[in-house]
Amino acid sequence: MTHKREIQGVVVKKSGDKTASVLVTRSVLHPKYHKTVKRFKKYLIHDEKNELNVGDSVIAIECRPLSKTKSFRLKTIVATGVK
């Protein structure tokens, strides 16, 4: 069985039917200055039931490519955003 990557982030945009854009933040150590800096990346995730809203905190799991840019599907909703 293969290991599937999991990402945790915040929904920043509803990108069409059954798709949401999730912003993932990670901390890395700067190679020269040895200070922790934040790095950001957006992923498109598949939301089969259209249950996500902007501001929700979610966990997504890697899956087979569903489109040109979408390779993650929704696993759980950790917290709901502001209504």
Swiss-Prot record:
Keywords on record: Ribonucleoprotein, Ribosomal protein, RNA-binding, rRNA-binding
Keyword Ribosomal protein belongs to the record: yes
MF GO annotations: rRNA binding; structural constituent of ribosome
GO CC, alphabetical: cytosolic small ribosomal subunit
A biological-process GO annotation: translation
SUPFAM superfamilies reported in the protein's UniProt record: Nucleic acid-binding proteins (SSF50249)
One Pfam match: Ribosomal_S17
Oligomeric form and interacting partners: Part of the 30S ribosomal subunit.
Recorded family membership: Belongs to the universal ribosomal protein uS17 family.
Function: One of the primary rRNA binding proteins, it binds specifically to the 5'-end of 16S ribosomal RNA.
PANTHER family found in the cross-reference section: 40S RIBOSOMAL PROTEIN S11 FAMILY MEMBER, SMALL RIBOSOMAL SUBUNIT PROTEIN US17M
Protein name (Swiss-Prot/TrEMBL): Small ribosomal subunit protein uS17
Organism, as annotated: Aliarcobacter butzleri (strain RM4018) (Arcobacter butzleri)
Gene field: rpsQ
